[in-house]
Amino acid sequence: VGSEMCIRDSAYMDGIEYKGGQGSWATTSGTFYWPITEMQFFGYTNDVTYTAPASSNAYPTISYTLPDTPADQKDIIVAYSKDVTKPSDNTLNLTFQHILTRINFAVKLVDSSYTYTVESITVTGAKGGTATYTFGGTEGKGGNWNITGSAPASGYSYTFDNTVTAKDGIYDYTQNDNSLMLYPQSLTDAKIIVKYKTEKDNATSVSY
């Protein structure tokens, strides 16, 4: 996890990397002492590029390039804490939030007398490529994406196990690592294309 610690418009800790887990984070970049002032903290994952604010009334940004291949997409998290004074116990808690949209799919049976096999699921018309996220808004929340990339021509193909068994009439294709991780956006031109087949009494019907 990368971090930025700012005194107004100047960075006190610039791009310092921390490693560890909840309650146990450490850096090999040296020892830092709290200055006699309020601080702002910005945290972000290592898969992004950080840009410092241009002025004292601006916020930093991170840029990210969303891979077209879902298996290469990452879960991007950030944290922001403003106007912090030195804690009496020397402990600072940062609450991270997910800033991409996680998408999984499940299919509900229309007629239980049929056998359904979903062969492919593709999302088209959703913008990808490069985007910039600006910190700000309510502490611990907020921030905005500016998506400058376009939607990939072939869309995003959802990878799943189509041999799963229906439970209570629903095929749930969610697995540990098969989520689509896309930018939050208005999907006015987006489509979900599902290719599937149904079987009954040795007869097969293919639909899209």
Feature annotation, model-predicted:
Residues 3, 8-125, 160-176, 181-200, ...:
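Short, low-hydrophobicity acidic/polar segments
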Residues 113-161:
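Acidic/polar low-complexity flexible segments
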